[in-house]
Each structure stands twice: as structure tokens, then as C-alpha cells.
């Protein structure tokens, strides 16, 4: 049976190793594909914003993952969008992909751009809040107590910021010997969430850091959104070191406040809550010493009074009666002890005599004394049957007072009449020699 195969031939314009496309052809086809994509609404954060000749060139970053696109706002569109747009703004934009054939670059042409509505941000934030709450990250039983006196405090804050100065100054005023490990990060903008997240990990791995403080001197809602970043919040929740959030914003508190072990209203408040006040602690020590001194003095005085009362009792004025009253009782105990000891000794002697008698009865020598003999072969084993000593076998006879050598004449049924007068139940190993001659 024959089989027909269908072989697809490459299209006439398909590139091959022998007939490759020119770069311009490939670029033209890419542009054609991209032009067919049409327009799309996208949401993100502006991370770069710069103008030239009335046009704006920038970059738009995804709010959740590490993804960025370049965009262009022509001057005609720039005049129609909000004037306060710029780096750090969260926006929604209508874009059309545009591929530049000459340079081989892809950019998004912005047709419209506007701020993300506050309602949209709050709704997204609330959804994340509910998710984290359902996972138990806000539960009170997850909160850890701060150490009473941390040896080293990890501080995450902006470089040379007021928050940094407030924390350091107030903590050192309260406890001058406190140590800090400060990690400077961005506290707003597109780099802030990643830098703060990494800083938490670095300080959490440091065995000397006993507590971590994240401090920022307040700010508007947009600037504080970085502290509601999901990855940052989850990293803070998983932190093994007690963590304090000191963002300094009472309203619209970021999610970091909810997962932190302690929320401080301001950086100054954080400094006051992570270290004790040395003057207050010294005062407590002085008060405790005073209370202990008063208690000890009172207790000693009470014991002295009790001793004086005991000394004044008539029974202690003459102590001889204590000995006299116990002398007769002691005599009775001594007599009874002597009597009991005598009984024990007598009983022991009786038991010893009985055991001695039993030992003598069981002794092999006792059996020999009764006229029996132990017959042994040349190898020293006891002879138990006549068959074990055939004619001519050398034997040794152990008697009560010595030993004899003998030679077996073989088994015999002739037993001397005197053997009948021997005891009827000799020891198993002490049978009279049979058929042996000495």
C-alpha cells in the first residue's frame, strides 16, 4: 500500500540561510506587526520624565513587578495632559506602540495620560489589606515584645533626613551608650520599595541587631504608598527581628504599620519606645534599693523582737530541765537497744550454726568420711560406670584420709559382702570402686 506525504514548501518570501532577509525587511515586518496592535490603556509609575523641544520622553514602571516601557509625549499631547505630571506620579495612559525602524527601538506614543484616581489607589490598597489580614499577618499574637535594652538598633531611613536625626538624638539622650547600625535608603520613588526591602533583609541577618526601626518623617499619601508595597510588607512580616514602623503619618496609615511589631507615631516616638530612659531607670533603681532597705530593716527588727521574747520566757531561764527530762527516756532507749541487739546476735548465731551443719552435711569430705571413695580416671574425671574403665585402666581412688592407685580388672558382678553394710545412698560422685584392684 503506497503512502502519499504532503511536504510544505517555504513561502517564496520566507528567509533561508541562502536567501536571508535584509535588516530593513525584518524591521519593516516588525513595524507592521506592532502597528496592528492598536492602542491600549496601561497603568504604572513614571520613573523618568524629561523634555526636549516641547516633547516629553520618559519611562513607565509596573506597580507590582519589575517591568518598564519607554514612552513619548508629543508637544501636541503634552498641552492637553495635567501639568503636574512628573517623576513618581502614578498614572493611567492611552498608548500606541511605535517601532522606529531606523534605530530598531520600541516606544509607546502617549495619546492620553492622567493621574490614577485616589479612589482606585485606595481600592487596590484595601484589597491587599484584606488579603494580608486573611493570611493572619495582622494578628496580635504575631506581635513580638521589644527587648528592654537592645544592644544594637538597626535603623532604615533616608540619608541625612530629619527622621534619622530625630531617632539618633532622642535615643542617645535617653540611653547614651546605645549603638546603631544605620542603612540609608530611598524613602520615596520607584527605588524606595526595593531598597527598604533589601535593608530589612540585611539587618535581619545581623546577629548583633536586636530591633529594627523604619523611619520617615511623614509625607502625603502618594509618597507613603511605597510602605504599602506588597513585597516590602511581606518581608517585614517575615522578619525574625522585632520591627518598629515609624513612618509618621496618622491618617491613611500604610500597611507596614499593620504588620510591624510596634507602630510609632513619629521617629521621635520610636526612639522613646525602643530604649529606656536612663534617668528614669536610675530613679527606679534608687526606689527599689530604698524599698529593699526598709524591708530588710523591718525584718531584722522583727527577728530581734522575737529573740527577745524567747529569751524572756521562764523555760529558757534554766536550761537544765531539758536534759533532765530526757535522761530517763534516753536510758530506756539504751536498755531496749541492748536487748534488741542481744536478740539479733543470738538469732544470728543460731542461723550460723544451722548453716554450718548443713554445709558439713553437703561437703564431699563428709561423704568420704562415711567410707565412700571417689574413683577417677587418668584424666581426672570421675568414674560413673564400669564400662568407662575396661580391663587394665589405671584409676585413682580418693579416700577420706588420702588416695590410692588402682588398676581396673573390668566389669564384674562379684561385690564383697562387706559392701552390703555400707550406707545405701552414697553421693552420686562417690560410688564404691567396682572391679578395680589396688
Curated annotation (Swiss-Prot):
User: Mind listing the UniProt keywords for this protein, alphabetically?
Assistant: Cytoplasm, Exonuclease, Hydrolase, Nuclease
Show the InterPro entries listed in the entry.
Exonuc_VII_L (IPR003753), Exonuc_VII_lsu_C (IPR020579), OB-fold_nuc-bd_dom (IPR025824)
Protein name in UniProt = Exodeoxyribonuclease 7 large subunit
Reactions accelerated catalytically: Exonucleolytic cleavage in either 5'- to 3'- or 3'- to 5'-direction to yield nucleoside 5'-phosphates
What role does it play?
Answer: Bidirectionally degrades single-stranded DNA into large acid-insoluble oligonucleotides, which are then degraded further into small acid-soluble oligonucleotides.
Q: Which family does it belong to?
A: Belongs to the XseA family.
Instruction: Establish whether keyword Hydrolase is in the entry.
Output: yes
Q: Does the keyword Hydrolase apply?
A: yes
Q: Name the gene that codes for it.
A: xseA
Annotated segments matching region Disordered? 405-438
- Record EC number: 3.1.11.6
Q: Name one GO biological process term.
A: DNA catabolic process
Q: Which GO terms describe its cellular component?
A: cytoplasm; exodeoxyribonuclease VII complex
**Gene Ontology molecular function: any one:** nucleic acid binding
On assembly, the entry states: Heterooligomer composed of large and small subunits.
Q: What is its main location?
A: cytoplasm
Where does this protein reside within or beyond the cell? Cytoplasm
Residue runs in coiled coils: none
Superkingdom, according to UniProt? Answer: Bacteria
